C-alpha cells in the first residue's frame, strides 16, 4: 500500500518558513482563479461572482477584528489586496484567506454549478516599509488600466 507521500506530490509552501502570519503588519496578497480562468468579469465588467469576490473581501474587517483591507482590486482572473493586521489576533492570514476563498467558492458553485473558482493557495508579500507599501498601492490602483500588460492577462473578457 502506498503512503500519502507516494500518492500525492509534496508541495512546497509559498509562505515564509517560521514566519508568524498573524503578526501586526501589512501584506500584499494575490489570489488567482483556477487555471487563471476569467470568472469574475463579463463584457469588461464585474459579473455576479466578481461582485461576490469584492463584497466578501470588504467583509473581512467585519468578521476578523484587527484586519483591515487598505486597497484591493478584483480583476478578471485574480484578486490583489493590501491586507493590514492592526492588532495581535488569533487568526493568521492563511486562515482568513482560506475562509474568504471558501465563501466565494460556495456562492460560485451556486451561481455556476461545477465551477472550480480558485487555484491552490495564494501569493503573499510581507510589506516591510512605506516605500514598498506605496509602490504596491499604486500597482493595485493602476492594475485595471494595465490589464493587457499584466502577467495574469490571457484574453479580453
Task: Specify the residue positions occupied by each region the protein language model found.
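Short catalytic/metal-binding and nucleic-acid-binding patches
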Residues: 1-157
Amino acid at each position: 500500500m502506498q503512503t500519502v507521500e507516494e500518492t500525492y506530490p509534496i508541495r512546497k509552501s509559498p509562505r515564509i518558513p517560521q514566519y508568524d502570519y498573524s503578526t501586526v503588519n501589512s501584506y500584499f496578497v494575490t489570489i488567482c482563479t483556477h487555471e487563471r480562468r476569467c470568472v469574475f468579469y463579463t463584457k469588461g465588467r464585474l459579473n455576479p461572482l466578481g461582485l461576490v469576490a469584492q463584497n466578501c473581501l470588504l467583509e473581512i474587517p467585519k468578521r476578523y477584528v484587527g484586519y483591515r483591507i487598505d486597497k484591493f482590486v478584483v480583476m478578471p482572473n485574480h484578486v490583489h489586496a493590501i491586507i493590514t493586521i492592526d492588532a495581535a489576533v488569533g487568526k493568521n492570514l492563511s486562515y482568513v484567506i482560506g475562509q474568504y476563498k471558501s465563501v466565494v467558492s460556495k456562492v460560485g458553485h451556486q451561481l455556476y454549478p461545477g465551477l472550480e473558482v480558485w487555484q491552490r493557495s495564494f501569493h503573499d508579500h510581507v510589506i516591510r516599509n512605506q516605500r514598498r507599501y506605496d509602490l504596491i498601492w499604486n500597482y493595485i490602483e493602476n492594475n485595471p488600466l494595465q490589464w493587457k500588460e499584466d502577467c495574469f492577462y490571457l484574453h479580453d473578457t
